[in-house]
């Protein structure tokens, strides 16, 4: 039989009472990415507007900022992280989950050697699996390289999008093709696969097909 934890809902977090946690415990959350890469114009005024002569965009550093519509929740999360002695990362058990969590921790200036970091690493949302996961928390820093990998991918995607999108858009506009064209590491190859499939459908020619049952 499972013990039903008591929870008190607050603004942006829950206060939890459960035998699993002997100390004062809070559960908070993000929605989407609370922290994201800054826009090009934040680095240099010449990158505020799309101009071919301003390309390529390669900042000397990469800054992260709180998403404009998520400032309230970030402030709540940041305050809880700062006062916590132990932080349990319970985002999705993959690289992107690590990236979301650690981006918030670093932006909140909540990373400290004086804090203990733990990781809930589970692959199911069944009650028994979640409870077992909390009973067997992993050292949080063991998964930190996943965050570094994901952030590297995030920056690479940003560079491709912020350079390729204006490059193609401006060149096409010079040729009389109006509109804005978004390019990306994943979306552009995927779009081409869709195009290839559509071409195959439109150019399909019926051919006789014989089935030999002998």
Where do the PLM segments sit?
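Prokaryote-biased recognition of long, low-complexity C-terminal linker/tail segments
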Residues: 153, 157-214
């Amino acid at each position: 039989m499972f013990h039903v934890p008591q929870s008190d809902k607050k603004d942006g977090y829950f206060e939890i009472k459960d035998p699993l946690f002997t100390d004062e415990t809070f559960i908070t959350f993000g929605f989407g990415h609370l922290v994201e890469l800054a826009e090009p114009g934040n680095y240099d005024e010449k990158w505020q507007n799309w101009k071919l002569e301003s390309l390529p965009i390669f900042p000397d550093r990469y800054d992260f900022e709180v998403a404009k519509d998520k400032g309230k929740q970030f402030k709540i999360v940041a305050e809880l992280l700062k006062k916590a002695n132990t932080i349990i990362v319970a985002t999705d058990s993959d690289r992107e989950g690590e990236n979301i969590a650690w981006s918030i921790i670093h932006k909140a200036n909540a990373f400290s050697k004086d804090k203990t970091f733990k990781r809930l690493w589970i692959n199911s949302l069944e009650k028994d699996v979640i409870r077992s996961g909390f009973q067997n928390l992993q050292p949080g820093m063991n998964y930190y390289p996943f965050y570094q990998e994901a952030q590297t991918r995030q920056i690479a995607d940003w560079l491709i999008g912020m350079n390729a999108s204006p490059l193609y858009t401006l060149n096409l506009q010079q040729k009389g093709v109006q509109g804005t064209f978004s390019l990306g590491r994943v979306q552009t190859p995927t779009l081409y696969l869709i195009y290839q499939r559509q071409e195959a459908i439109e150019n399909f020619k019926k051919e006789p097909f014989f089935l030999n049952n002998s």
